[in-house]
Amino acid sequence: MARKTAAEAKETRQRIIDAALEVFVAQGVPDATLDQIARKAGVTRGAVYWHFNGKLEVLQAVLASRQHPLELDFTPDLGIERSWEAVVVAMLDAVHSPQSKQFSEILIYQGLDESGLIHNRMVQASDRFLQYIR
């Protein structure tokens, strides 16, 4: 079998991340399996392991690939009004975009994953936002 090009490997990796997002939403992070993710992505389990060392690393990639509205970069020179506007626009996007909805579901409903990744990410985002608006 011919080796994949870098572009094909990147595309496969992204398909796995997108599939993982759907599987994590449908099954919950703790109950999702790499087999389910591989099937959803249309790849072998070996392909998943070629790109990731395990489910935790897949979850990290899913989290790294998306941004929650409270994770926006807030800078003092932006001003409080513009910052709130950015949050509202991002929240509206999260409500209307299917992938953003799925990502938000993971962050909200799966926040107590065994690794603590999701919970820690949301706490950090909330803390940054609260520091900015004070």
From Swiss-Prot:
The entry's DNA-binding region? 33-52
Q: Which GO MF terms does the UniProt record name? A: DNA-binding transcription factor activity; transcription cis-regulatory region binding
Task: Mention any Pfam family matching this sequence.
Answer: TetR_N
Output the Gene3D superfamilies linked to this UniProt entry. Tetracycline Repressor, domain 2
Upregulating conditions: The ttgVW operon is induced by toluene and styrene, but not by the antibiotics carbenicillin, chloramphenicol, nalidixic acid, tetracycline or gentamicin.
Keywords, alphabetical: DNA-binding, Plasmid, Transcription, Transcription regulation
Which residues does UniProt call coiled coil?
none
InterPro entries reported for this sequence? DNA-bd_HTH_TetR-type_CS (IPR023772), Homeodomain-like_sf (IPR009057), HTH-type_TetR-like_transc_reg (IPR050109), HTH_TetR (IPR001647)
Q: Which domain of life is it from?
A: Bacteria
Q: HTH tetR-type domain: from which residue to which, for each copy?
A: 10-70
Main function:
Unknown, does not seem to be involved in regulation of the ttgGHI or ttgVW operons.
This chain belongs to which protein, by name? Uncharacterized HTH-type transcriptional regulator TtgW
